[in-house]
Amino acid sequence: MKALITGASSGIGRDIATELAKRGYDLILVARNIEKLNQVKENILTNCNNINIKIIQMDVSTPENCKNLYNQVNDDIDILINDAGFGVFGDFTKTDIDKEIQLINTNITAVHILTKLFLQDMEKKNKGHILNVASIAGFMPGPLMATYYSSKAYVVRLSEAIREELRRKNSNVKLSILCPGPVNTNFNNVADVNFKAKSLSSEYVAQYAVNEMLKGKFYIVPGAQIKCLRFIAKIVPNNIIAKFAYKVQERKR
């Protein structure tokens, strides 16, 4: 059994890799930072020396690299974890457009391409799991993080649509979306925000995500508070949520 994880050098991606290693999966770890990837590999093999780990240094923010990654792997992948992603904080008219384009390419385009390519293979075998890492942000408008929230909404809607297509084919391929709230990862530093709300540990989120994914759960929402927030987002009008979200985001400055 083999799993491919993007964004595997830190945070949720790293900890999902660790959880899958404990379950005996061979791993292909993908990220930009080769030093961190080597450290993750070393740490995992210290505790799980009965598996194989391959590391690939790659930036998935370009379509060409995503296609090259698929061709380079050329392997029988049982689980795909699309975790690579980051956020940009600030007023939409003032945030850096080049950074936002990189965000869109990483959070949206890479997920789209890798899901399509590996899903085609999984459908031929009629088995496999795909976990797309979204966010609770994907269910609501997010002023002051407009591009990030919108990118996660894309992941949610894409995954929901694919799930229905798989259902109508009676496919055994399972697709899940992970929708956490604030998590203790490097995300805050990259997005240049300071979450005031209590964050879950990335280890807890990863363990919860893997358990639920392997059960075939579609919406994976860790934490009682975030489950409650998702319920509220279903019943409260978006304009009210946007006003509330702005006040919450403003406190992160």
What is the role of each PLM region?
Residues 115, 151:
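Active-site helix of classical SDR
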Residues 91-92, 99-104:
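Substrate-binding pocket helix/loop in short-chain dehydrogenase/reductase
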Residues 135:
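Residue(s) in the substrate-gating loop at a strand-loop-helix junction
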Residues 177, 194-230:
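C-terminal helical subdomain
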Residues 23-39:
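Conserved glycine-rich Rossmann-like NAD(P)H-binding loop of the short-chain dehydrogenase/reductase
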Residues 34-35, 56-68, 97:
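The beta1-alpha1 cofactor-binding region of Rossmann-like NAD(H)/NADP(H)-dependent oxidoreductases
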Residues 9-10:
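Conserved glycine-rich cofactor-binding loop
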